[in-house]
C-alpha cells in the first residue's frame, strides 16, 4: 500500500445529535437501574426550546423522563438561553409506547439461552494495533480533541467556550503505518466576547497541543480552527438533533464497515447494540493476542433466532494464523447468542449514558474493551 491520507471526525457532547443520544441513554440507564429485563427503544429529537422523547418501552420501572432530560441537558452545559438552549426552560414532550407483542414473543424464551435476537441485522467490530487502545488513530484523536474541549470548558480554563464542537483529524499513512498528521480541524461554539485570533491561539495551546503527539506533527501540518470565523449560534438552535445520527463517530470513524444500526436508547436485547459491542470485544482480543495486526468481525442475526446466521473474520493480510482457524477460535471462545453475549460482557447494568459521547469503543473501562480472552486465544492458536 502506498502513501495515503485517512480522515475521521468526532463531535462534542453538546452537539445536537449527541444531546439526543445522551438523553436516550440516560433514560435507558434509569430504567435498567430498576428493571434490568426492561425492553427499551428510546428515541430523542431536540430543537430550539424543545425536546421530544419517544419510542417503545416495556418495563415495571417508573422514571421521570422530564427530569432525566433536564438533568442530562444541564450536565452537558446548556443552562442559559444565551447558548440557544436552556435545560431549565425547554419544553419536554414524551411519546412512549410499549414493545410490540409480535417482537416480544420472538425475543423472550423460557430458557434464557434460547433468547432470540430482537431484530435481524448485521454488525461489525474492529481492532487495530496502531494505538494503545487498539483503535484507529484518526477517530481516537478526534474524540480526544472534543473531550479536551469539554474539559477546559467545564473547569473554567476557557470560560468563553460553549458546549457544541466538532473535530476532524487527517492522518498520513505509508505502507499502512502512521507517518504523521496532515490536517486538524476544530470548530467550537463560543460566546460573543472573544476575538477569533484569541480563540484560535487558546484552542491551539489548551486543546490541540496537549492532545496530539508531537512526533506526528510537522511544519506541514495544517490547522483549521473555527474556519468560518464565527460559531456563536450552536447546539439545538443551530441544528436539530436526533438519536442515532452519528453512527460513524460512535464506532471507528469510517476505518471499518458499519451494519447501519445505531446504539443509543436501545437495551442489550437489541443486537444492533450488544452484538456490535461483542464484535469489538472479539476483534480486540484477537489483536491483543497477537493473532492479527488488524481484525474486523462481522456477525449477523435473524429476528427471534438465538444462533448468529453468520460469523466472518477479516484480517486484511495481517493474520499470524489462517483465518479459518481464527473463525473456529471465535466460535469456541465467544458465545455470540444474544443471551450469551449479554452475560459475557455483563450488559444488564446502567452504563450507557457515558457511551453516548466520545465513542463507544477505545475507552478501557467498558466491559467490551477487556482483553481477558487474549491469553486463551494465543495458547489455543499455539503461539508462544
Swiss-Prot record:
SUPFAM superfamilies, sorted: S-adenosylmethionine synthetase
Keyword Transferase: yes
Top EC category: transferase
Entries under HAMAP family matching the protein: S_AdoMet_synth1
Gene: metK
Its biological purpose: Catalyzes the formation of S-adenosylmethionine (AdoMet) from methionine and ATP. The overall synthetic reaction is composed of two sequential steps, AdoMet formation and the subsequent tripolyphosphate hydrolysis which occurs prior to release of AdoMet from the enzyme.
Binding-site residues, Mg(2+): 17
One GO biological process term: S-adenosylmethionine biosynthetic process
Domain of life: Bacteria
Name of the protein in its database record: S-adenosylmethionine synthase
Origin species: Serratia proteamaculans (strain 568)
Residues given in the record as ATP binding sites: 15, 164-166, 230-231, 239, 245-246, 262, 266
Cofactor note: Binds 2 divalent ions per subunit. Binds 1 potassium ion per subunit.
Alphabetic keyword roster: ATP-binding, Cytoplasm, Magnesium, Metal-binding, Nucleotide-binding, One-carbon metabolism, Potassium, Transferase
Pfam families xref list: S-AdoMet_synt_C, S-AdoMet_synt_M, S-AdoMet_synt_N
Binding site for L-methionine: 56, 99, 239, 270
Main localisation: cytoplasm
Amino acid at each position: 500500500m502506498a502513501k495515503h491520507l485517512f480522515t475521521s471526525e468526532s463531535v462534542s457532547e453538546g452537539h445536537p445529535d449527541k444531546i439526543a443520544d445522551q438523553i436516550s441513554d440516560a433514560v435507558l440507564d434509569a430504567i435498567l437501574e430498576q428493571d434490568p429485563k426492561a425492553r427499551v427503544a428510546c428515541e430523542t429529537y431536540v430543537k430550539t426550546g424543545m425536546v421530544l422523547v419517544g419510542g417503545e418501552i416495556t418495563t415495571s420501572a417508573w422514571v421521570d423522563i422530564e427530569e432525566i432530560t433536564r438533568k442530562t441537558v444541564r450536565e452537558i452545559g446548556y443552562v442559559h438561553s444565551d447558548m440557544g438552549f436552556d435545560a431549565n426552560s425547554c419544553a419536554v414532550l414524551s411519546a412512549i409506547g410499549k414493545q410490540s407483542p409480535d417482537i416480544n414473543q420472538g425475543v423472550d424464551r423460557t430458557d434464557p439461552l434460547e433468547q432470540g435476537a430482537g431484530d435481524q441485522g448485521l454488525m461489525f467490530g474492529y481492532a487495530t494495533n496502531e494505538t494503545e487502545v487498539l483503535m484507529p488513530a484518526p477517530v481516537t484523536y478526534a474524540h480526544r480533541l472534543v473531550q479536551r474541549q469539554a474539559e477546559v470548558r467545564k473547569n473554567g480554563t476557557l470560560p468563553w467556550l460553549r458546549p457544541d464542537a466538532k473535530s476532524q483529524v487527517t492522518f498520513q499513512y505509508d505502507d499502512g503505518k502512521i507517518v504523521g498528521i496532515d490536517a486538524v480541524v476544530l470548530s467550537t461554539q463560543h460566546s460573543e466576547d472573544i476575538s477569533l485570533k484569541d480563540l484560535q491561539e487558546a484552542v491551539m495551546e489548551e486543546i490541540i497541543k496537549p492532545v496530539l503527539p508531537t512526533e506526528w506533527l510537522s511544519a506541514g501540518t495544517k490547522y483549521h480552527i473555527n474556519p468560518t470565523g464565527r460559531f456563536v449560534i450552536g447546539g439545538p438552535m443551530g441544528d436539530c438533533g436526533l438519536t442515532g445520527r452519528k453512527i460513524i463517530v460512535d464506532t471507528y470513524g469510517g476505518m471499518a464497515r458499519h451494519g447501519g444500526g445505531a446504539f443509543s436508547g436501545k437495551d442489550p436485547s437489541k443486537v444492533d447494540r450488544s452484538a456490535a459491542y461483542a464484535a469489538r470485544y472479539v476483534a480486540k482480543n484477537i489483536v491483543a493476542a497477537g493473532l492479527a495486526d488488524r481484525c474486523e468481525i462481522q456477525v449477523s442475526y435473524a429476528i427471534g433466532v438465538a444462533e448468529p446466521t453468520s460469523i466472518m473474520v477479516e484480517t486484511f493480510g495481517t493474520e499470524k494464523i489462517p483465518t479459518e482457524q481464527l473463525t473456529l477460535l471465535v466460535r469456541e471462545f465467544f458465545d455470540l447468542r444474544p443471551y450469551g453475549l449479554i452475560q459475557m460482557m455483563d450488559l444488564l447494568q446502567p452504563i450507557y449514558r457515558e457511551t453516548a459521547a466520545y465513542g463507544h469503543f477505545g475507552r478501557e473501562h467498558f466491559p467490551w474493551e477487556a482483553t481477558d480472552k487474549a491469553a486463551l486465544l494465543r495458547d489455543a492458536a499455539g503461539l508462544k
